[in-house]
From Swiss-Prot:
GO cellular component annotations of the record: cytoplasm
Primary role: Hydrolyzes ribosome-free peptidyl-tRNAs (with 1 or more amino acids incorporated), which drop off the ribosome during protein synthesis, or as a result of ribosome stalling. Catalyzes the release of premature peptidyl moieties from peptidyl-tRNA molecules trapped in stalled 50S ribosomal subunits, and thus maintains levels of free tRNAs and 50S ribosomes.
UniProt cross-references to HAMAP family, sorted A to Z: Pept_tRNA_hydro_bact (MF_00083)
Similarity comment: family membership: Belongs to the PTH family.
GO molecular function: peptidyl-tRNA hydrolase activity; tRNA binding
Species of the source: Cronobacter sakazakii (strain ATCC BAA-894)
GO biological process, alphabetically ordered: protein quality control for misfolded or incompletely synthesized proteins; rescue of stalled ribosome
Stated name of the protein: Peptidyl-tRNA hydrolase
Predominant cellular place of this UniProt entry's protein: cytoplasm
C-alpha cells in the first residue's frame, strides 16, 4: 500500500496564507520545495498541483483553491481522474486536539468538526478511510472561539513549533514512501518540537 495523492488543506488567498487553518498547505508547499516540483494552478482539479517521485513512488500533490468547506471537490476530481483509491490518499490538516509542535498520522475516523475533512468524506462517497496527517495547532480552550482561532495567525513562538512539526512530518512522509508506514509512524509519533 502506498500513497499516490497528498493533499494540503487550506483557504485560498493571501489573507489566509499564514492562518492556522492553512497548516496542511504549509506541509505540501514544503514537500514541493524539497523535491523541486513547484505547484501550478490546474483548473480541472480546483487547486494547485504538482508531481513528485519518492523512491520510485509517483505521488501527486494538491492544495485546493476552493474554500476549506469545499475541499472534497478538488480531492474527488483528482482521485477520480487518476483512479486513486481513498486509502492511497493522505490529507494534511490543522488539528485542534494536538498541541503546536506535534503531528500524527491516522487512517480513517470521523471529521472532528473539521469542515475540510467533512467535505472530503462526503465527496469520496461517504468514505472516511483515507490517511490523515494531523498537524497540531492547539485549542483556544473555548469551543465558541474556535473559528476565530483557526482563522488567526499563531504567535511567533507557536509558529516555530508548527514549522518544526511540518518539517518532521515531511521527513516522515519520505520514510513512509521508502520504508513503510510503521517506521514513519513510530518516528513521527515520538517527535515533539521544543
Amino acid at each position: 500500500m502506498t500513497i499516490k495523492l497528498i493533499v494540503g488543506l487550506a483557504n485560498p488567498g493571501a489573507e489566509y496564507a499564514a492562518t492556522r487553518h492553512n497548516a496542511g498547505a504549509w506541509y505540501v508547499d514544503l514537500l514541493a520545495d524539497r523535491f523541486r516540483a513547484p505547484l501550478k494552478e490546474e483548473a480541472k482539479f480546483f487547486g494547485y498541483t504538482s508531481r513528485i517521485n519518492v523512491n520510485g513512488n509517483d505521488v501527486r500533490l494538491l492544495v485546493p483553491t476552493t474554500f476549506m468547506n469545499l475541499s472534497g471537490k478538488a480531492v474527488a476530481a483528482m482521485a477520480t481522474f487518476y483512479r486513486i483509491a481513498p486509502d492511497e490518499i493522505l490529507v494534511a490538516h490543522d488539528e485542534l486536539d494536538l498541541p503546536p509542535g506535534v503531528a500524527k498520522f491516522k487512517l480513517g475516523g470521523g471529521h472532528g468538526g473539521h469542515n475540510g475533512l467533512k467535505d472530503i468524506i462526503s465527496k469520496l462517497g461517504n468514505n472516511p478511510n483515507f490517511h490523515r496527517l494531523r498537524l497540531g495547532i492547539g485549542h483556544p480552550g473555548d469551543k465558541n472561539k474556535v473559528v476565530g482561532f483557526v482563522l488567526g495567525k499563531p504567535p511567533v513562538s507557536e509558529q516555530k513549533l508548527i514549522d518544526e512539526a511540518v518539517d518532521e512530518a515531511a521527513r516522515c512522509t519520505e520514510i513512509w514512501l521508502q520504508d513503510g508506514l510503521t517506521k514513519a509512524t513510530n518516528r513521527l509519533h515520538s517527535f515533539k518540537a521544543q
